[in-house]
């Protein structure tokens, strides 16, 4: 039966039929890539990496054209400065993208792994093995580098993916996809149709309605953008709506370390979802720490907003409002609050945080342990910048996004988050009837997989 026949009639409107054809091609490709040998997938990834380097000039030229158009959008108020910053590519960023692809090559293949091997009875063996999800729909704003990260992870995990970047990144995405496709064409065993680029909002709207045909939607972008996706599809969604991160400077913090971590967590890349938006400072260390931190942050061009206790110590801070505690600036703006205790810091984070990434700076091991154990977030750090919350930095090779939901996968989602599992049962004519009733044969339930994952 064809996919178009399986699809509800309401989804098969004339405007959606071209997309259905693309999804059909993607599903057919996914059946093939699901069983590709690791060597073929790695060869495809190396071909992608090589092609990206060979196509550097047209990629950067396309990006410059996007930036020119995006600059006018910023002037017109149609695009934020942070989105403009995420759009920019250069030779260094392209080299990082290629390094990310090659790191994925070095990672183990997540497909076909045995998670469980159990002998239910003699000759009756149950296995739980990893398998690709199938067809992914990934929609992202700005950040054309996301296209390369996602494509690499899709290839390694044997998934097909339909990618849609923001209109402001259209030319960049087209140039990147052209390079990737040129590379994949060098690997005859790799099926066409596994990586596809969508280019219109109408396609996104139609994609969100393809429940049963698309297995997972992954949005990457602003909180309003992610909320739109969540509210307009019944397909499972993996992602986060906000990146409202905090750094708490404890009373026992090393001041020099705390200043460096504050500056790095805010200014290293302020448009990133793992940059801090609020700095919490214990009242015992605030008189010493705050003036120094304010000076260091202002040298980086950060606009600072403080609560009344902060402004007693640094009077020229902009007064912080209630809205500031729940705002993801994604810009060189930081709110600062003085707290009376670790308990108050944790309570503030639990009330206003987005469960993305939270950090404490302290030399008190007990305070650090409490913070790590009690703060509910996908990433909880001690004496480390929140900017480490990233799939590449975690050694995942790349990430398709960061999930703040409680159910797994959580945090930066790399290879392991793009596979599911199947139960495979091998018997020798075993019947359930033999295991029921007064003369029931007992199960043995002997595990054959040790703690290392080896049989």
Curated annotation (Swiss-Prot):
GO BP of this protein: L-proline biosynthetic process
Reaction catalysed by this enzyme: L-glutamate 5-semialdehyde + phosphate + NADP(+) = L-glutamyl 5-phosphate + NADPH + H(+)
GO molecular function: glutamate-5-semialdehyde dehydrogenase activity; NADP binding
Cell compartments where the protein resides: Cytoplasm
Keyword rRNA processing tagged: no
The EC number(s) this enzyme carries: 1.2.1.41
Annotated pathway: Amino-acid biosynthesis; L-proline biosynthesis; L-glutamate 5-semialdehyde from L-glutamate: step 2/2
Family: Belongs to the gamma-glutamyl phosphate reductase family.
Protein name: Gamma-glutamyl phosphate reductase
Lineage summary: Bacteria, Bacillati, Cyanobacteriota, Cyanophyceae, Synechococcales
